[in-house]
Regions:
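Acidic helix N-cap motif at the loop->helix transition within catalytic regions
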Residues: 15-19, 40-49
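Short beta-strand-to-loop acidic/aromatic patch adjacent to the donor-nucleotide binding site
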Residues: 75-86
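Short beta-strand/loop segment that forms part of the nucleotide-sugar
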Residues: 8, 20-21, 29-37
């Protein structure tokens, strides 16, 4: 059995994290919740639900992911999903399948290909994602449909990508670098539902604009970099 670690960045998600952890299927051999500076009981709830909790005081989605990766050095495959219950953790089996069957190095769960519940994402967030994906496809020659956080990658591929982005450009950096370095990338449909609690990013137009600007900059920088 392959060693599969699930990394879940979390910031003030005490209402959702217990449900997320409860829904993770047994294919995961280790689950790590990265507390990214929560001021609520996220860490306590996660521990009570059976997860290992590590702390990353430096704010940022990418920073939390990097801390989670460092915490699972023995993992052969690392999966990422959100802590807000917007993803369906049970679909981890489908996300992992192309890697486990030897057909992919990186699998991205595409919300565009799956079923999106009403009010799962505000319109400005959907349009912003389409803009970012469109730019990536144009500059890199990919045929992606999403930059969603629910994904899985082999440890070897992840090491080769030398991930650096500290914030929300993390997923875009991974996909651009994977494409430029010739990794086998596949998308699988994943469903999406309204998150529990308020969003720290896409809940406001300003938040989405800030995140979107960072993602666009990440795409352009890595797409035009000689090193990839």
């Amino acid at each position: 059995m392959r060693r599969v670690a699930v990394v879940i960045p979390a910031l003030d998600e005490e209402e959702a994290i217990g449900l997320v952890l409860k829904e993770i299927p047994p294919v995961a051999t280790e689950v790590v919740v990265v507390d990214n500076g929560s001021r609520d009981r996220t860490a306590e709830v996660a521990r009570a639900a059976g997860a290992r909790v590590v702390v990353e005081p430096r704010r940022g989605y990418g920073q939390a992911c990097l801390r989670g990766i460092a915490a699972v050095p023995e993992a052969e495959i690392i999966a990422f999903l959100d802590a807000d219950h917007s993803d369906y953790p049970a679909q981890l089996v489908a996300v992992l399948e192309p890697i486990l069957s030897g057909d992919a190095d990186l699998v991205v769960g595409s919300r565009a290909l799956g079923r999106r519940a009403r009010r799962a994402q505000p319109l400005h967030a959907i349009l912003g994602t389409r803009l970012c994906v469109g730019l990536m496809n144009l500059l890199v020659g990919t045929r992606a449909t999403d930059l969603g956080p629910f994904r899985a990658i082999t440890a070897a591929a992840l090491k080769a990508l030398d991930m650096r982005d500290p914030d929300f450009g993390w997923t875009a950096e991974m996909q651009v670098k994977a494409a430029r370095r010739g990794l086998r990338v596949k998308e699988v449909p994943v469903d999406y539902r309204p998150r529990i609690g308020s969003s720290k990013v896409s809940g406001t137009v300003l938040g989405s604009l800030r995140a979107g600007a960072g993602i666009l900059g990440t795409i352009a920088r890595h797409a035009c970099s000689r090193a990839g």
